[in-house]
Amino acid sequence: MKRAVVVFSGGQDSTTCLAQALHQYDEVHCVTFDYGQRHRAEIDVARSLALKLGVRAHKMLDVTLLNELAVSSLTRDSIPVPDYEPNADGIPNTFVPGRNILFLTLAAIYAYQVKAEAVITGVCETDFSGYPDCRDEFVKALNRAVNLGMAKDIRFETPLMWLDKAETWALADYWGKLNLVREETLTCYNGIKGDGCGHCAACNLRANGLNHYLADKAAVVTAMKQKTGLQ
């Protein structure tokens, strides 16, 4: 039996990954992290979506210690979430230091316990957000370290790594979940479900990707299939 663990936040990317995993694996587990994030609605959205998609095993993990250590606009109400700036340099204040290091490591420990062969995460390098822990180089390096530390061969899969946002929308549509992703996921840095606030970087990236996909579906689907190997 093929088993996978999906790192699941209830956002666009992880929901798209979950939709695909449910078609490609016999048994899919989700793990969602409570790290004291600014918008607690994320956890409720993740729980609701997992139930709606038929996930039988959904693990909620308390990692609120991260909130004490990692200062970010996503962990502190006192730090404002910036509006989207197309040419902004440096790491944005929405970056939570160590988040993906911790999430992937804990997901791998969970995968070890449930005998899953893969940990799936929706990180992406193509539409680079400025987050160093979304890079392919980082994921592969951590994967090697975790496998050495547990004497296990667990794959870290990144289905969206080389897709842009338009292609990610195409992938959600391929699995019949475009409307679900558009209406019921929470990607917005200001905690607004669906199309979000329309001002933050996450909303801008999401909206531009959707507009591109809807305007040029055939070309975007072709590019998505070439990158993913789907037929």
Curated annotation (Swiss-Prot):
GO terms for molecular function: ATP binding; ligase activity, forming carbon-nitrogen bonds; zinc ion binding. Zn(2+) binds at C188, C197, C200, C203. Pathway: Purine metabolism; 7-cyano-7-deazaguanine biosynthesis. Keywords: ATP-binding, Ligase, Metal-binding, Nucleotide-binding, Queuosine biosynthesis, Zinc. It catalyses: 7-carboxy-7-deazaguanine + NH4(+) + ATP = 7-cyano-7-deazaguanine + ADP + phosphate + H2O + H(+). It comes from the Bacteria. InterPro entries: QueC, Rossmann-like_a/b/a_fold. Signal peptide: none annotated. It is an enzyme of class 6 (ligase). ATP binds at F8, S9, G10, G11, Q12, D13, S14, T15, T16, C17, L18. Its EC number is 6.3.4.20. Its cofactor is Zn(2+). GO terms for biological process: queuosine biosynthetic process. Binds 1 zinc ion per subunit. Transmembrane segments: none annotated. It holds the Pfam family QueC. Belongs to the QueC family. Catalyzes the ATP-dependent conversion of 7-carboxy-7-deazaguanine (CDG) to 7-cyano-7-deazaguanine (preQ(0)). This is 7-cyano-7-deazaguanine synthase. It comes from Salmonella arizonae (strain ATCC BAA-731 / CDC346-86 / RSK2980). The gene is queC.
